[in-house]
From Swiss-Prot:
SUPFAM superfamilies: Subunits of heterodimeric actin filament capping protein Capz. This is F-actin-capping protein subunit alpha-2. The gene is CAPZA2. PANTHER family: F-ACTIN-CAPPING PROTEIN SUBUNIT ALPHA, F-ACTIN-CAPPING PROTEIN SUBUNIT ALPHA-2. GO terms for molecular function: actin filament binding. It comes from Macaca fascicularis. F-actin-capping proteins bind in a Ca(2+)-independent manner to the fast growing ends of actin filaments (barbed end) thereby blocking the exchange of subunits at these ends. Unlike other capping proteins (such as gelsolin and severin), these proteins do not sever actin filaments.
Amino acid sequence: MADLEEQLSDEEKVRIAAKFIIHAPPGEFNEVFNDVRLLLNNDNLLREGAAHAFAQYNLDQFTPVKIEGYEDQVLITEHGDLGNGKFLDPKNRICFKFDHLRKEATDPRPCEVENAVESWRTSVETALRAYVKEHYPNGVCTVYGKKIDGQQTIIACIESHQFQAKNFWNGRWRSEWKFTITPSTTQVVGILKIQVHYYEDGNVQLVSHKDIQDSLAVSNEVQTAKEFIKIVEAAENEYQTAISENYQTMSDTTFKALRRQLPVTRTKIDWNKILSYKIGKEMQNA
């Protein structure tokens, strides 16, 4: 181990540490960070060299943050990234600083938004918030309106998580939806992501995603928002159902084919009484 440490440069150590951090399961950033910190044993090197990994993790995970003085949480995403550690809260029309390590928002200030898209953005946000409230007990959504390549574009992001460290599991749902405002019809593009980590008596991760494309009829703001939500609801319901059915099938067939639930003796070993078993006596006499 000592020889390996001598061979690794600081740059290589930071690169490895950053990979661990970026791939930390939902709700386990602090645990992974603390473990990496112990392994690296150089706080300055970690903070300076892996700062990009802290930011990338929060952007990828759609980390929700509460801004003091404002009721609703906002998501940290690439679409709200204004650079230099500042982010946009489009609902409240404010910009704020975000500490990627502490996950804290500070210094909220008024911020300009894309006025040409704002009425569309507001309509979609109102409809999406009602949908999220109905389907996600802990859900947070942020809707952006901006011009991309000259086209008025709506981007809707949803995040919902359950962190159950006491029960040895954590999970997060993320979805991102995008469409341009064009006459008659437009194309809706979405991506749905699920990540779950279960680590009681084992270590299992579910990482899944699905790409979505659908056509959206464009009329006025309110009606278009309603039609958009229908697409979102149908796709997310179908995805969740498919995931549940797939893993139930795997549990009933594939997993059972891979390994017996009980050993050949049809009884589980009580490891606290191992010495009373014949194998325990044999091990003791070995």
